[in-house]
Amino acid sequence: MTKREELIKLKPDNHDMRLKYYELVLKSSSLENLPGFSLPKGYRYVYYREGDKKDWIAIETSAREFVLPMEGEAAWEKYYAGKGKELEERMFFVETLDGEKVATATAFYEPRDLSGAGWLHWVAVKREYQRQGIAKALISHTLQRLKELGYPSIKIPTQTNTWVAAGMYLDFGFRPVPENAVNSREGYGILRTLTNHPALAAFEPVPYEEIWDSHMVEIEKKLREQYADLVHFRVLEENGQERILFCTQTGTGEWKKAF
């Protein structure tokens, strides 16, 4: 089988490190008619309360944003450290009637963004609770909160690796920020290839075999040769070096061998 044939046979996960990475930034200034969706029966919204950091990390890890808890701790420190009082009015969880927190999103902001836009932050649903309509309901609920907080527009940072979520944001009426549309033009072409979304008609679709990062595909292949029960992996850049973390059905680890 040729390399091209191998790539064509690949099927993307909804959070897939093998896809070429591009940062995507979407925006909407039309907040009057935001789509509304209700949670499925048996779930409810609750705000963040002190001590909920562990639940946030657990949800984001289950959704494959992280492999190791230390990644979640680092992300929390970067975005939310010292902002507990703010989070009590901005961070949502979706909870089962038994009190298990299964999804999260935050009505937040980006201090470096001088446009005054609100930012939809860190949307995630635990893996086993996906495909129930929770994400759409949570997104609409959090967007409504951003509107209540008085933001004139809303931005959403996303990426090609989470292409299913990016397509959902397009369904909500969000569109590429012009500058980002230029800088990540191939990324939007990849997104068009994967979603065929009509909002991306201005972007040339990328041939399917070219949406994949060959280095990441090779890493996944090598890991799977060693760990048949591989679930997913992440590659971190630290001081110019790659750090490869992986999760199997029985635990987590770090790949120490050279590629």
Put a short name on every predicted segment.
Residues Y169-E179:
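Conserved acetyl-CoA-binding loop of GNAT-fold acetyltransferases
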Residues L146-T158:
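Conserved GNAT acetyl-CoA-binding A-motif
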Residues M1-K41:
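Acyl-donor-binding surface of acyltransferase catalytic domains
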